[in-house]
């Protein structure tokens, strides 16, 4: 199931690599309600974050992954600056 929310990017993390070799980059995202949200981009989805800067307003589409421990289980599918 995919979810879509709108909010403000407050920080873009560094690219890291999991023990299995997957590239991961985390985003700090403040929803319109004021709640903080910390989704992760995996693998080639990291390219979606290259143009994003703190303060940008964006629409984020994501899904929840059952795998926990290696990375945040909220996975970015698409992100578009609005």
Predicted segments, located by residue:
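Single-stranded nucleic acid-binding surfaces, predominantly the OB-fold ssDNA-binding core
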Residues: 1-82
């Amino acid at each position: 199931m995919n979810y879509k929310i709108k909010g403000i990017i407050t920080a873009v993390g560094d690219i890291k690599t999991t023990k299995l070799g997957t590239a991961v980059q985390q985003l700090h995202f403040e929803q319109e309600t004021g709640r903080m949200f910390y989704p992760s981009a995996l693998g080639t989805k990291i390219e979606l974050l290259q143009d994003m800067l703190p303060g940008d307003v964006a629409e984020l589409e994501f899904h929840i992954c059952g795998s926990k421990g290696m990375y945040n289980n909220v996975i970015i599918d698409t992100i578009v600056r609005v």
